[in-house]
Structures are given as C-alpha cells and as structure tokens.
Design a protein with these regions (language model features):
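Membrane-interface junction motifs in transport/secretion proteins
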Residues: 51-85
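Transmembrane alpha-helical interface segments in multi-pass membrane proteins
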Residues: 301-303, 310-354
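A structural signal for hydrophobic secondary-structure junctions
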Residues: 81-221
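Peri-transmembrane interface segments
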Residues: 16-27, 239-242, 246-291, 303-305
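A short beta-strand structural signal in non-transmembrane regions
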Residues: 65, 160, 221-244, 259
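Short cytosolic juxtamembrane segments of multi-pass membrane proteins
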Residues: 401-415
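Hydrophobic alpha-helical transmembrane segments of multi-pass inner-membrane transport and secretion
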Residues: 21-48, 275-310, 333-342, 390-394
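Short helix-loop junctions at transmembrane helix boundaries
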Residues: 338-384, 397-401, 405
C-alpha cells in the first residue's frame, strides 16, 4: 500500500467542520487553479482561432504562393507573364502543390449617377477555387467566370456596394484607362461578398479572366500570374524554395522573367502582427501559472500549519520527513486535479458556447471579424493540463520542506 497516498486520500476526503481555516484555503487554491486553466484555455483557443481566421482571409485573396513577373512582385504595377498550359502543368507537378489558378489584375473606376470609386478588378477563370468567395457571399451568386469570353458580370464587396449604393442585379459602368484612351464597360452585379478585411474589401472586384486580359491589351496566354495553394501551410517556404530553383529567373517567350513570393512576403505587416500574438499568449500563460502556483503555495502552507499536530503524531509513529512531504504533495495533487476539472469545464464550455452561438461580438472595422473566432485544439488543451499539474507540483516542493522543521514533541501538544 502507498502509505502517503492513503493518508492524503483520507485527509482530503474527510469533512471536518473544525478545520475552519484550511477548508476555505483549499477552496481558494482549487479556484485559483480552475480560473487560471480556464483563462489559459480561452486565450489559446481564441488566439489560434483569430490567427487562422485572419490568415485564411488573406490567403483567400492571394493563395499561399504567387508566381508572376519579377516586376509585378516588386512594384504596384501589373506586368504580363506567359501562363500557358506548359507552365501551369510545370507548377502543378511541383512537390507539395495542391492547386494552381491563373489571375489577372487591372485598375478601373466604378461610376454611378451620384458617385465613383477606384477599384481593382481581379480576373479569374474556370479553374479558380471559389470556396473562399462562397464562404463570404452575403447576396447574389458567383457567376461562371471564363478565360474564353466575357460575361460582363462582377462580384463586389459590401463596402463598395454601400459606398456606391449598389445592389445585386443592378448594372454599373466601369471606366478603364488604356494607352491614353478611356474604355467604358457596363457590368451586371452578380453578387456581393463581405470578408471584413478592409484593405481588400475597399477595392477588390472579381470578373472574368478574359475581360481583365483584354482590358490590359495582353495576349491570350498572358496573365498577371498564377496563385498556388500548397498542401501544408507550415511548409510553404519549403515549397517556394522549389519554385526558386525551378521557375524563378526563367524567361517566357515574350522576354519576361518569372519570379515567386509567398503570401507572408506579400503581406509582411499582417503576418508579423499575427506572430506577435504568440508573445501575448506566453505572457498570459505565465501570469496564470503564477496565479495558480501562488494560491497553491499559500493553500499548502495553511494546511501544513493546521495539520501540525497530525505531522507530529506521524513522526512519533516513525514516519520520516520524506513520507510526510509526499503525503501533502499527494494532497496538493488532489486539489490541483479538482481545479483542473473545474477549469476544463469552464474554459471548454465558454469556447464551445462561442463557437456554436457567436455570443461575443467584435467590431469588424478594427478586428477584421464580427465575432470572436475560436478554434479547439484538444492536444494543446491536454498539454496545458499536464503542464499546469507539473509546474504547480514543482513549485510546491520547496514549501513542503517546512515539514522537516516541525518537532514531534512540540507539535503533538500544538492545538
């Protein structure tokens, strides 16, 4: 029989009304662990959800990697690059690549009777993965975009629609400047999307690849570039290095040079900001572990002092300091365990409530999302539980040495 464990279970399970000091101390220590763990779970799940939601929105507008003309990736101007079947097949055969799609960008002005707005038209074709657009559609539908003909239909954001007072099904004129000539086009608004990523929502419209290429006066096999989706975002740099060796610095038949950049290189400020959130998480984890540790230390010291008489009796019966220390560490383990159970119920419960109801709202103009995004990561939650238990027990080792300073004769007479 494990003697320290047996004694600890008897002490912990005993309902002793005389222990007016230790009972509240146990409850406070348990609550400290529970609240600390709950805050850690909520913080980690919210930060993970926020990072992945914002990342997915940025990736939705530009995929993981872009292969384009060298000058296009270095400046704000659009330079054409050949994107024929041979190059597309070459990109698709690259290890780690999941999907390849062409795109062409052009600038224009949307004009109504009362207002006008400069926007960026993104031309896309049949192979374009519209999953991201579907997820963010709020009105209308996505037309069948083509690289063979113009459907004269566009998708606009809610931001643009509100500013120009446009609705689905209405027609709007767009004006494009080409070779010092103004080229008007009339489009039908097929649908309206909203991502809350303001830097894109303010300017981005979707139309046919054919339309964008023609408006830029490019050849049929030219485009702004290709967007590549990789199988594993964590290995995007590794996949891009293959393009650097395989595609970059090669020249197409028009004399243009291929180059590539990852979405992190194209949007460094956003991804640096997201990386900084990890620092906030570590600060929160450290603070909550400290709170749990302090409450456990104070709780254990109170229990040891109140059980001085019992410690003296155990020593008189032959129990050594190590055995008694182990007894109180087991007692602390029970307190921590109960705190972990309550903390998991509270933390996971709040996260589940937010995930399925979206009860906690945010200002999308500031945070890019309308509700607090959360993401369950059960392996990480398990690691938080284990780490909390281990760290709390480690910090309790030093206070437990107080037992070695308790003298049996004096402590037996202590009441």
């Amino acid at each position: 029989m494990n003697f320290p464990l047996f004694i600890a279970r008897r002490i912990y399970g005993r309902n002793d009304e005389k222990r007016r000091v230790s009972a509240p101390a146990v409850r406070i220590a348990t609550a400290g662990v529970a609240i600390g763990l709950a805050v850690m779970i909520i913080s980690v799940c919210v930060i993970l959800g926020f990072k992945h939601t914002i990342r997915d929105k940025v990736v939705g507008f530009g995929s993981h990697i872009q292969v384009a003309d060298f000058m296009t990736l270095q400046t704000s101007e659009q330079y054409p690059i050949q994107m024929g079947d041979s190059m597309l097949n070459e990109l698709k055969r690259t290890q780690g690549v999941k999907h390849v799609q062409r795109f062409a960008m052009t600038q224009g002005i949307l004009k109504t009777d009362n207002d006008f707005l400069g926007v960026a038209f993104k031309g896309i074709a049949e192979e374009y993965d519209t999953t991201f657009i579907h997820q963010n559609m709020i009105e209308g539908s996505i037309p069948k975009f083509s690289d063979k003909k113009s459907g004269n239909k566009i998708l606009i954001s809610k931001t643009i629609a509100d500013q120009l007072k446009l609705h689905t099904g209405e027609k709007v004129f767009a004006y494009f400047l080409s070779h010092n000539n103004v080229r008007p086009r009339r489009f039908t608004i097929a649908g309206i999307y909203q991502t809350n990523l303001s830097q894109y929502d303010k300017v981005t419209c979707f139309t046919d690849l054919y339309t964008a290429v023609r408006l830029n006066s490019w050849e049929e096999d030219q485009a702004s570039g290709a967007e590549i989706t990789v199988e594993d975002f964590d290995r995007v740099d590794e996949t891009e290095s293959i393009f650097i060796n395989k595609v970059n610095r090669t020249i197409d038949k028009y004399g243009e040079t291929y180059s590539s950049k990852t979405i992190k290189e194209l949007n460094p400020s956003i991804f640096q900001w997201l990386d900084m959130l990890d620092v906030n998480v570590w600060i929160i984890l450290a603070l909550m572990i400290a709170v749990a540790g302090v409450t456990m230390i104070s709780g254990l010291l109170i229990i040891i002092l109140e059980r001085t008489n019992m410690i003296g009796v155990l020593k008189a019966l032959g129990a050594n300091n190590t055995t008694i220390r182990h007894t109180f560490l087991w007692f602390a383990t029970f307190m921590i365990g109960r705190g972990l159970i309550y903390g998991n119920i509270l933390g996971v419960g709040i996260i589940a409530l937010q995930k399925y109801t979206g009860i906690f709202k945010l200002d999308p103009t500031i945070y890019y999302v309308s509700t607090v995004p959360v993401e369950f990561n059960f392996p990480l939650i398990l690691c938080l539980n284990i780490a909390t238990l281990i760290i709390c027990l480690i910090v309790l080792i030093v206070p437990s040495f107080l037992i070695s300073h308790i003298h049996p004769v004096k402590s037996i007479r202590y009441e």
